[in-house]
UniProtKB/Swiss-Prot annotation:
The lineage of its organism: Bacteria, Pseudomonadati, Spirochaetota, Spirochaetia, Spirochaetales. It catalyses: (2R)-3-phosphoglycerate + ATP = (2R)-3-phospho-glyceroyl phosphate + ADP. It is found in: Cytoplasm. Gene3D superfamilies: Phosphoglycerate kinase, N-terminal domain. Pfam families: PGK. GO terms for biological process: gluconeogenesis; glycolytic process. Pathway: Carbohydrate degradation; glycolysis; pyruvate from D-glyceraldehyde 3-phosphate: step 2/5. Substrate binds at residues 20-22, 35, 59-62, 136, 173. ATP binds at residues 224, 315, 346, 375-378. It is an enzyme of class 2 (transferase). This is Phosphoglycerate kinase.
Length: 419
């Protein structure tokens, strides 16, 4: 078990804490504060315990990569591009520090860099909070060279006696502020958000209450194959939806019309189906579809009542017969993990499958099942349908929760002290 902030004495200690404040920004204004609010319990606890100071660090997008993409798009559209204004509007932590200050009703000081801030840290009043600038303004943060990462990690380690990692969303990244820093601080513990994520995800991987159902959706088999393989070990049923379902249907010799499929992953999909059959895991693929002729929000929805899709159509969502199968399985499950939508829920006409899946998972939760929703799109879906609070746990880490469920060791967790 990893140690948390509750396992160490924080009184009069200087704390350096990695948070995940990678929030959507527009013109220097926070658009969604979910991730900031998620860190508040740990921040408040540290302050209540009488810490000497609290230094917070986070990335906020990837300034150089994002600016390069935005510049290319502007050039393509024949529009002017002001790189400095773009970065100031999207990647600066100062507005986040001000926003946090408003939530805490406490002053939050801001440092314009992650390097050379020791005097500023020392000058903080008792219980003072300092927010460092975006860690990714320093190339050392994400460097592939360990020695280069260590330059930033050593500097950051000077700001605290205790390192707290509460950024589950970046726990799968081996960066200077998420893992390397732990080599230069004697006490390394998890915050409450990190602890909560592990508490809910670990049983799904190692010892879930049976029957256990995994609902895996999204566009590509390639990005989900490792999690499918991993969940196969414990799942009683595997519901495969979204764009990736058509690769599996094609393997079974079904007609998929113009639907998305991955030629290169046909063999992988076939092996997975064979493995599931050997292990007695029930695989549920769509038996009917909501289709359209084009991939667009205004496309006309066409119900195809069979598994085979006509040549002129593409699958966009699951149909009512498929949802009836989902209902039977989901409502009889004791644990459920859901990663990825089962249709193009962003388009109103093709959102029913994902909405109904969310409602079924919520109903199973009410019946006592342990339910976890992870992955950006499925989280966005439960939020869209106002069902997030009806799930046992909605994970804050897209890639991190996926890698955790794949059974991978996450650097941001592996670097912490254990009991």
């Amino acid at each position: 078990m990893i140690k948390t902030v509750k396992d160490v004495n924080l009184k009069d200690k200087r704390i350096i804490m990695r948070v995940d404040f990678n929030v959507p920004m527009k013109d220097g204004v926070v658009q969604d504060d979910t991730r900031i609010r998620a860190a508040l319990p740990t921040i408040k606890y540290i302050l209540e315990q009488g810490a000497r100071s609290l230094v917070l660090m986070s990335h906020l997008g990837d300034p150089s990569k994002d600016a390069k993409k935005a510049k290319e798009k502007a050039e393509k559209d024949g529009k002017p591009f002001d790189e400095e204004a773009y970065i100031n509007g999207k990647h600066r932590m100062k507005p986040v520090a001000e926003y946090l200050s408003g939530l805490l009703k406490l002053p939050v000081d801001f440092a314009p860099s992650c390097m050379g801030q020791l005097e500023r840290v020392k000058a903080l009043p008792q219980g003072g909070i300092l927010m460092l600038e975006n860690t990714r303004f320093h190339k050392e943060e994400t460097s592939k060279e360990k020695a280069e990462q260590q330059i930033l990690a050593k500097e950051l380690s000077l700001y605290g006696d205790i390192y707290v990692n509460d950024a589950f969303g970046t726990a799968h990244r081996s960066h200077a502020s998420t893992a390397e820093i732990a080599n230069f601080v004697n006490t390394r513990v998890a915050g409450f958000l990190m602890e909560k994520e592990i508490k809910y995800l670990e049983p799904m991987l190692n010892n879930p209450a049976k029957p256990m159902t995994a609902i895996i959706g999204g566009a590509k088999v390639s990005s989900k194959i490792a999690v499918l393989e991993s969940l196969l070990k414990n799942a009683s049923s595997l519901i495969i939806g979204g764009g990736m379902a058509y690769t599996f249907l094609k393997v079974q010799g079904k007609k998929i019309g113009k639907s998305l499929f991955e030629e290169d992953f046909m063999d992988t999909a076939k092996n997975l189906l064979d493995k599931a059959e050997k292990q007695g895991v029930k695989i549920i693929l769509p038996v009917d579809h909501i289709c359209s002729e084009t991939f667009s929000p205004n496309a006309e929805a066409v119900l195809v009542e069979s598994t085979d899709i006509p040549d002129n159509l593409m699958g966009m969502d699951v149909g009512p017969k498929t949802l009836a199968l989902y209902k039977e399985i989901i409502l009889s499950s004791k644990s459920i993990v859901w990663n990825g939508p089962v249709g193009v829920f962003e388009f109103e006409a093709f959102s029913k499958g994902t909405e109904e899946t969310a409602r079924l998972v919520a109903a199973a939760t009410e019946k006592g099942a342990l339910t976890i929703v992870g992955g950006g799109d499925s989280v966005a879906a439960v939020n869209k349908f106002n069902l997030a609070d009806k799930m046992s746990h909605v994970s804050t880490g897209g890639g991190a929760s996926l890698e955790f469920l794949e059974g991978k060791v996450l650097p941001g967790i592996a670097c912490l002290d254990t009991i």
